[in-house]
């Protein structure tokens, strides 16, 4: 995301997507697909609304955000979990939407969506 014309890295609060950019590890199962889906949802130039929970940044200085696509209000964090592109990830004290994320993750897991139907053990989303 760009704020004031400068890039500022972010993390979607409350969700855990498979890792794809750790230089010391191979990409995790379904990581490329989750990244492609996110890029499809948010092509360069997409207007978004960012909201935060309790904390503004994580220990890596990334913005912790709930992200909505401005044109239609799509709640991207929830979309990622509901489609099986990510798992829910409680990050206290930033838990305003955690109940919704946990329910969406449970449904995606039960239905075998996304990473849950691709990465083997239904209780182990990535790795």
Where do the PLM segments sit?
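Small beta-barrel nucleic-acid-binding modules, primarily SNase/OB-fold domains
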Residues: 1-127
């Amino acid at each position: 995301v760009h704020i004031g014309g400068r890039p500022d890295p972010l993390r979607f609060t409350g969700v855990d997507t498979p890792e794809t950019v750790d230089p010391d590890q191979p990409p995790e199962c379904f990581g490329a697909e989750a990244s492609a889906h996110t890029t499809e949802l948010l092509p360069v130039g997409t207007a978004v609304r960012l909201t935060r929970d309790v904390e503004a940044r994580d220990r890596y200085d990334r913005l912790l955000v709930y992200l909505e696509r401005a044109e239609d209000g799509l709640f991207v964090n929830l979309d990622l979990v509901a489609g099986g592109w990510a798992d829910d990830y409680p990050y206290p004290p930033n838990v305003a939407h955690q109940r919704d994320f946990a329910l969406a993750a449970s449904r995606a897991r039960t239905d075998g969506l996304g990473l849950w139907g691709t990465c083997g053990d239904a209780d182990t989303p990535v790795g």
